[in-house]
């Protein structure tokens, strides 16, 4: 079996010995012939067939390497965070992905735990985002807001999204912004702290505390938009900080096959990857990519 290897050494604050051990352990389980880029082979210290890709030190390193490996290997092993998984899927490969989390949050439903035994191929539903003439794939959510989560000095913190796009990691508190969201004839417009677009999840079922998202899941809607009065993409708040901004009010809109149109004067992010400020369109698409997940016996 030929195994393509994609590694984001910047995920989760950097590549260390602990992460290297995780990667090597997974590769030993796969027990195949490895194919990857020069830089990845050197970082891991492995024997591998090399493919030539232009190094940019940006997300394009992931996208371009996935494209170079697609169709030339049996599986593409992707090591990184949720944003790396999004970038790999955005290349729309035909070859299945095995995604292992070594990032900041590691909550993407496309991820596979590193201690897997048997694997099976699964088709993934995803959020397809159109922004600035580009198309991206997200599995967690599309978020509008002034902060994103990142790792600074080994700690998970919220950083300013605009400055992050300029290569700076600066801890910041959320700013409010004006935005308009359209789903068909339904419109929400105003000043918000965050806007989230996500696929519904069975975990919302029976959880009335989740508000409108609980009913969206119960009725079988594919997705839901949540416009939140305060910025909640934070990880450094104390109880007193939360008390200070409460009450927090959320307005939701459910959707199936409609296109969610967002016009905002704050940063749009795709699974933690900031895209820019402006207009975005989001839709849910089945079978955006195939991934390997732990095998489940039929009940």
Curated annotation (Swiss-Prot):
BP GO annotations: NADP biosynthetic process
SS bond partners = none
Q: Which Pfam families has this protein been placed in? A: NAD_kinase
GO-annotated molecular function: NAD+ kinase activity
Q: Which domain of life is it from?
A: Archaea
- Please give the InterPro entries that the UniProt record associates with this protein: ATP-NAD_kinase_N (IPR017438), NAD/diacylglycerol_kinase_sf (IPR016064), NADK (IPR002504)
Name of this chain's protein: Uncharacterized protein AF_0748
């Amino acid at each position: 079996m030929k195994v393509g290897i994609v590694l984001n050494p910047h995920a989760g604050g950097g590549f260390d010995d602990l992460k290297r051990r995780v990667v090597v352990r997974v590769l030993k389980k796969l027990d195949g012939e490895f194919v990857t880029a020069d830089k990845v082979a050197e970082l891991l210290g492995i024997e591998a067939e090399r493919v030539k890709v232009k190094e940019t030190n940006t997300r394009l390193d992931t996208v371009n390497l996935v494209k170079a490996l697609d169709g030339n290997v049996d599986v593409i092993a992707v090591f990184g965070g949720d944003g790396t998984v999004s970038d790999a899927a955005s290349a729309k490969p035909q070859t299945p992905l095995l995604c292992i989390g070594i990032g900041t949050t590691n909550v993407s439903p496309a991820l596979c735990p590193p201690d897997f035994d048997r694997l099976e191929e699964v088709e993934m539903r995803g959020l397809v985002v159109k922004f600035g003439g580009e198309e991206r794939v997200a599995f967690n959510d599309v978020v509008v807001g002034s902060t994103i989560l990142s790792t600074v000095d080994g700690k998970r913190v919220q950083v300013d999204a605009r400055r992050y796009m300029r290569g700076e990691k600066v801890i910041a508190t959320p700013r409010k912004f004006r935005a308009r969201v359209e789903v068909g004839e339904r419109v929400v417009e105003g000043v918000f702290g965050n806007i989230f677009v996500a696929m519904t999840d069975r975990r919302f079922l029976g959880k009335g505390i989740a508000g409108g998202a609980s009913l969206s899941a119960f009725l079988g809607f594919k997705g839901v938009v949540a416009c939140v009065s305060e910025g909640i993409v934070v990880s450094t708040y104390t109880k007193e900080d939360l008390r200070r901004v409460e009450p927090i009010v959320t307005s939701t809109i459910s959707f199936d096959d409609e296109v969610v149109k967002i016009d905002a004067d704050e940063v749009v992010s795709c699974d933690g990857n900031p895209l820019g400020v402006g207009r975005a369109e989001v839709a849910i698409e089945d079978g955006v990519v195939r991934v390997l997940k732990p095998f489940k016996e039929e009940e």
